[in-house]
Amino acid sequence: LSQNISSLISKNLFERILVHRNDRACGAKGFYTYEAFITATKTFAAFGTTGDTNTRNKEIAAFLAQTSHETTGGWATAPDGPYSWGYCYNREQGSPGDYCASSQQWPCAPGKKYFGRGPIQISYNYNYGAAGSAIGVNLLNNPDLVANDAVVSFKTALWFWMTAQQPKPSAHDVITGRWSPSVADSAPGRVPGFGVITNIINGGMECNSGSNALMDNRIGFYRRYCQILGVDPGNNLDCANQRPFG
């Protein structure tokens, strides 16, 4: 199945999409490799292998776009445009806090911080715990692995992408057309498309408030990547009029 992924996204395409990630200005330069991405996808066999070629390409574009927004080093007048600077960082910038929430199932380890790391910027002990359990790595005790081991890093992002967290569907099911909105979803405007994936990831901050720069940045990456991969981005790209999930 991993062969299917590499037949859709070659190393050459990967380099074109994430063209500036190894720029000297990028904190994660040298970290995110094509080989680590392909290796990580083997753990999540349905990723990029579900549906027809068009659907599969759209999923790859959507995943790389959402994660590029989370890790971008781009700015408005950046060389090759702001959407050529995804995967510039692998840890939250600034002085992030502990991101420790009370949890019986996934208690924080002493002295460990669970700030954003990796392509999806996984945050909080309960996400590190659940992701680590799913991929067979103790991330509660070793959260820095997500910024030190590129395969583990990609796996945490793929885990988030492939896993539904109630009441939200998985991003995978949305982009592959497997999610049908319930009445409770349709009334608040949550319809299939790239926009509802933004809602899944960060709806409370970015959705149901008209146009905003964060939401538009995600769409910008997605349009560029769809163009490179030769697919139509589809409808419902924004979440401007979608209420966040409960």
Swiss-Prot record:
It catalyses: Random endo-hydrolysis of N-acetyl-beta-D-glucosaminide (1->4)-beta-linkages in chitin and chitodextrins. Induction: By fungal infection. Its EC number is 3.2.1.14. Keywords: Carbohydrate metabolism, Chitin degradation, Disulfide bond, Glycosidase, Hydrolase, Plant defense, Polysaccharide degradation, Secreted. It is found in: Secreted, Extracellular space. InterPro entries: Glyco_hydro_19, Glyco_hydro_19_cat, Lysozyme-like_dom_sf. One of its GO terms (molecular function) is endochitinase activity. Disulfide bonds join 26-88, 100-108, 207-239. GO terms for cellular component: extracellular region. It holds the Pfam family Glyco_hydro_19. Defense against chitin-containing fungal pathogens. This is Basic endochitinase.
